[in-house]
């Protein structure tokens, strides 16, 4: 009976995956010890989503929010509250992971984590229609690497630090 139950469970999970019910966000574990490994998984989710037609299978900046440091999480929460108040799009009007709104990723290169004590940086280079560079700044909190800031280094307004943008935004509008 157990074998039948296990087979039924496996079949259900497989069909849910085929239907796009299992969201991409759940697939990038926040427990990865190396921040570069985690970032590779995040960008792989975007690659997979390009091939998926399911809206439930689309990655989002929520992947970063789940792994944000306490200070960055507070800034993300402030921005989310602004959106929830019906003010439309607030500080973040694009997906900073891919440095755009639409994406066609190629040549994704996640560099190694450069660790100095309880801080680390990881540089990600990729093409999203044009060449892009994002630098992720991590801090160790509660024994885990957390994203403390992201700096997009491409485009006419570069560099753009996400933490600074969230801090400086006029939420009274």
PLM feature spans:
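Surface-exposed, charged secondary-structure patches
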Residues: 65-130
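Low-complexity, intrinsically disordered terminal/linker segments enriched in charged
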Residues: 114-119, 123-135, 149-173
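Boundary of Sec targeting at the N-terminus
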Residues: 25-29
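Stable alpha-helical elements in mature extracytoplasmic
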Residues: 35-39, 60, 68, 162
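Short, aromatic-enriched amphipathic alpha-helices that serve as compact interaction elements
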Residues: 31-51
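Bacterial N-terminal signal peptides that target proteins for export
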Residues: 1-11, 15
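A short, surface-exposed beta-strand/turn
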Residues: 135-146
């Amino acid at each position: 009976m157990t074998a039948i139950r296990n087979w039924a469970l496996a079949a259900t999970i497989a069909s849910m995956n085929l239907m796009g019910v299992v969201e991409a966000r759940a697939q990038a574990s926040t427990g990865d010890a190396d921040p570069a490994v985690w970032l590779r998984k995040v960008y792989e989710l975007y690659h997979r989503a390009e091939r998926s037609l399911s809206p439930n299978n689309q990655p989002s900046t929520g992947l970063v929010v789940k792994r944000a440091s306490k200070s960055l999480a507070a800034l993300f929460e402030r921005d989310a509250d602004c959106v929830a108040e019906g003010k439309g799009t607030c500080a973040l009007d694009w997906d900073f992971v891919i440095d755009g709104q639409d994406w066609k990723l190629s040549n994704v290169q996640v560099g190694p984590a450069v660790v100095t004590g309880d801080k680390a940086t990881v540089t990600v280079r990729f093409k999203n229609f044009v060449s892009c560079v994002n630098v992720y700044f991590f801090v160790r909190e509660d024994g885990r690497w957390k994203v403390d800031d992201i700096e997009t280094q491409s485009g006419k307004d570069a560099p753009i630090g996400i933490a600074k943008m969230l801090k400086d935004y006029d939420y009274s509008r």
